[in-house]
Amino acid sequence: MTLRFYDTASAEVRDFVPLEDGKASVYYCGATVQGMPHVGHVRSAIAFDQLTRWLEFRGLRVTVVRNVTDIDDKILAKSAQSFGPDWDAEPSARQTEEWWALAYRYEQEFENAYESLGVQRPTYEPRATGHIPEMHTLIQRLIDRGHAYPALDDSGDVYFDVRSWSKYGSLTRQNIDDMQGAPDADPRGKRDPRDFALWKGFKDGEPVTAKWESPWGAGRPGWHLECSAMVTKYLGPRFDIHGGGLDLRFPHHENEMAQSQAAGDEFANFWMHNGMVTYEGEKMSKSIGNTVSPAEMLELASPRVVRYYLGQAHYRSILDYRPTSLQEAAAAVERIDGFIHKASSKVGTGAPDVSPQANMPAAFIAAMDDDLNVPQALGVLHETVRAGNTALASGDLEGAKAALYSVLSMTEVLGLDSVKRPEAVQGREHAALEVLIEAQLEARAAARANKDWAASDAIRDTLAAAGVVVEDGADGATWSLKRD
């Protein structure tokens, strides 16, 4: 089956044919590092991590770029709040955080969140502040082509002229006259209120460290310009996929596409957007107190459970969070892990005789090829787990082995094997744990053989108190670790 993805620009699912044979180029918007990561950030990262993994599984060499917006009005505002009345004081007298330090601190928080949930590092992760010359070049190209102009009030701002580009609004299928004015700068100096800032002139009271010299005066780049300059530097003027959250379609992605194409770049062949996360059907909002952060989720469940939950819905659909969501995800992960452990103890986990592609069920491949239909793919995964358990119960070790290898292949491509999982038996520490538990089970088996039921029950109870669940079967006892 041909890979097919939904393209926001054409509003249809269409065949994905890489621009370069055997390769795929993907850019998705990273964070504006002004605060702690929220659940929407990590859901988006997991969605595009699933996309990357699937493209790689299908034999493509994937180049991924995820930017870091480390200079922005919101970052400066957050830093200014920390300065309070001491903004103009000598640095030694301030109990504050400079904007660049604040941005870097939150950037590390995002990196930690991504890593804890098994999101692969991108090929390139450029910071906006490291690409100012490329932004200047792009602005000049737009001015030269008649699509941008310095502000009429000598403020040092440079704006994109939306009416100069006839395709403006095409990504989100809007008419210019129906749009509201751009909120990113004072409307003075604009030809049209909808024109958006490419360059923001330095203003009195702003930190001098947050300005760069330019042909139009000292200042800093506009948010939309940053992404266009960075993506074309690393992926070129035309690339396969541009992604991000649904909330970025307008104005951010609309403006990105307009300024890039107006500058002469073909830009993205596909636009892919992931859905939002809601709380019991309502939009998450700090003001009404119905938000949940990745850190809070990780206090309630293991990283693998959180990744399973955030990645279980179709990437384009809304993911609704409820107080029981993580419990339900934990039960699903436990079913998978329980089978993997039981089957591994019977047939081993050595390298399979065939490739991961051969182990992957055809129905799973068809689901993932069809616009990353992860819910359908997970259905195949759980059906394989059920079939594997049935094979184990009937003593069909070859059937159990085939199911095990299929399950391992599916969890790998979904990224569920790469998440830190302290409950899994892996590594030297867990190997030692396994030896100790198996020794206890051998002692219990000996007690049962001698009909010493009290000793047998005592060993079982001791293991249970340590979080080890023992199950007796026709072929002996198996064990697994209890999940919270």
Curated annotation (Swiss-Prot):
The keyword Protease does not apply. The lineage of its organism: Bacteria, Bacillati, Actinomycetota, Actinomycetes, Micrococcales. Zn(2+) binds at residues 29, 227, 252, 256. InterPro entries: Cys-tRNA-ligase, Cys-tRNA-synt_Ia_DALR, Cys-tRNA/MSH_ligase, CysS_C, Rossmann-like_a/b/a_fold, tRNA-synt_1_cat_dom, tRNAsynth_Ia_anticodon-bd. Its EC number is 6.1.1.16. A motif ('HIGH' region) lies at residues 31-41. GO terms for molecular function: ATP binding; cysteine-tRNA ligase activity; zinc ion binding. It comes from the Bacteria. It is found in: Cytoplasm. Its cofactor is Zn(2+). Keywords: Aminoacyl-tRNA synthetase, ATP-binding, Cytoplasm, Ligase, Metal-binding, Nucleotide-binding, Protein biosynthesis, Zinc. The keyword Protein biosynthesis applies. It is an enzyme of class 6 (ligase). Its main location: cytoplasm. ATP binds at residue 286. This is Cysteine--tRNA ligase. GO terms for biological process: cysteinyl-tRNA aminoacylation. It catalyses: tRNA(Cys) + L-cysteine + ATP = L-cysteinyl-tRNA(Cys) + AMP + diphosphate. A motif ('KMSKS' region) lies at residues 283-287. One of its GO terms (cellular component) is cytosol. Belongs to the class-I aminoacyl-tRNA synthetase family. Monomer. Binds 1 zinc ion per subunit.
